[in-house]
Regions:
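Catalytic Zn2+-binding segment of zinc metalloproteases
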Residues: 419-423
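Carboxylate/His-rich catalytic cores and anion/metal-binding grooves
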Residues: 340-364
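Bacterial N-terminal signal peptides
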Residues: 5-15
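Short pre-active-site segment immediately N-terminal to the catalytic Zn-binding motif
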Residues: 337-341, 395-415
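Catalytic zinc-binding patch centered on the HExxH motif and its immediate surroundings
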Residues: 337-339, 376-396
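A well-structured
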Residues: 16, 20-334, 345
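N-terminal secretory signal peptides that target proteins for export/translocation
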Residues: 1-2
Length: 423
């Protein structure tokens, strides 16, 4: 019952954080129907899927070499540095492989080829984790003063000081080599719930439909939530909201089990590493006390009155008795403004002029590069992952995924993701 209850919260969060649609057409367009200028180009990562295969084969032959450092990791500074350099090379390669495969898949989650490619990269990463399971336990067998001495002898190691310190802070939760290897191998199972949910939502969900302000029937999708939740017509907002939840309601039992699996996975790893609970495992790994988390929730709960007052004022302004979830983003004015993607680009540039001109126009050049070199995937298409994100990896320009629908929030999202990309 607990999981059936919290699944509603999970669904609501998913809906509220998704972005928007590419057009006002009845059906969501296929990816092939989207103009190429609005789609990211991944050929600068790998020229083709075949080139991706070549690099995957290379790293599969490379990563076993990490086993050569076992038993002599801290024999001298040069050996430690060599191990770090090899680890960086492997992770840079895997990051590049993941960047290509995962972004290709997220553009269309129904693509079975990219589903397989993502899984293959994940499998190599897990195998690499098993090969390097000895690494941290072996390092922690020595006192930290050994590493301090190494850093004094070889200045190139100094740049990894924080990595070393973090490892020693986590020492109480680092297991033996054998146990670390088992946990790494179990990692393949930990992501099954999330993967199953993503594929189910992209391929198996049968969305409801609703009629817009003009009576035109539209097929619902997560991408349409952002636009129609801001409709001035309450009937449209309510019908859209109900249509959004049709597939979730039909899959409630399945989703409850998937979420249960995700939660139990977190509990398993927390217990295995000797944390008090999964909350401590998540917080302590980032150097944050669980008290901060709990105090934040307590503080919010103790100061909800302004939010309740806002809801009362908004309900009164909208002329309704009580605000409901689909009224949360309703505009107070009786009209809405839509912005083309090109208008959004200009608005962002105009708004950021003082920043864009700093440092000899560095940010200006960066923004133009993002706009002009197919580094942004703009509109929703069938199978595309909902929401927005910025994706980056070593030695490659970042990429941004949107589901742009022309709302002011979409303009803000573009600016937000550009900020992540520049950072």
């Amino acid at each position: 019952m607990y999981f059936r209850a919290i699944i509603f919260y999970f669904i609501f969060i998913m809906a509220c954080t998704t972005n928007n649609e590419s057009s006002a057409s009845t059906e969501i367009p296929l990816r092939s129907e989207i103009d190429s200028k609005y789609k990211w180009d991944l050929t600068s990562v790998f020229e083709s899927d075949e080139a991706w295969e070549v690099e995957l084969d290379r790293v599969k032959n490379l990563y076993p070499n990490m086993s050569e450092f076992k038993g002599k990791l801290l024999s001298n500074p040069e050996t430690l540095l060599s191990s770090i350099r090899l680890d960086e090379e492997v992770n840079m390669s895997l990051g590049k492989l993941w960047h290509y495969a995962s972004n290709s898949l997220n553009a269309d989650l129904t693509n079975e080829k990219y589903q397989e490619m993502v899984q293959r990269v994940r499998n190599v990463w897990i195998k690499y984790g098993a090969v390097t399971a000895y690494y941290t336990p072996e390092m922690l067998e020595s006192d930290y003063s050994v590493l301090e001495g190494f850093m004094n002898e070889n200045s190139e190691l100094k740049q990894y000081e924080k990595v070393f310190k973090d490892a020693y802070i986590a020492k109480p939760h680092i297991l033996s080599e054998k146990e670390e290897k088992l946990l790494t191998m179990a990692g393949k199972l930990s992501g099954v719930s999330n993967e199953a949910y993503d594929i189910m939502r992209a391929t198996d969900f049968e969305w409801g439909s609703f009629k817009d302000e003009n009576g035109k029937e539209l097929t619902m999708s997560p991408g349409r939530y952002g636009k129609y939740t801001k409709s001035t017509d309450r009937r449209v907002r309510e019908d859209m909201y109900k249509a959004l939840y049709v597939p979730f309601k039909n899959s409630l039992n399945t989703m409850s089990v998937l979420m249960k699996g995700n939660v139990e996975g977190n509990i398993f790893y927390a217990n295995a590493r000797g944390y008090e609970n999964s909350l401590e495992a998540k917080m302590k790994g980032s150097g944050i006390s669980t008290d901060i988390y709990k105090n934040l929730i307590k503080s919010v709960n103790n100061n909800l009155q302004p939010l309740h007052r806002w809801a009362e004022i908004k309900a009164k302004t909208l002329g309704i008795e009580k605000i409901k979830p689909f009224d949360t983003y309703a505009p107070l004015a009786d009209f809405t403004i839509e912005y083309t993607y090109e208008e959004a680009q200009k608005i962002v540039v105009d708004a950021l002029q003082p920043l864009l001109q700093a440092n000899e126009g560095e940010l200006q050049k960066f923004t133009e590069k993002m706009y002009n070199e197919n580094l942004i995937d703009v509109f929703e298409n069938k199978g595309k992952e909902s929401g927005a994100y910025m994706s980056s990896t070593w030695d490659l320009p970042p990429r941004i995924k949107l589901n742009y629908a022309g709302t002011l929030d979409d303009v803000f999202t573009l600016a937000h993701e550009l900020g992540h990309a520049y950072h």
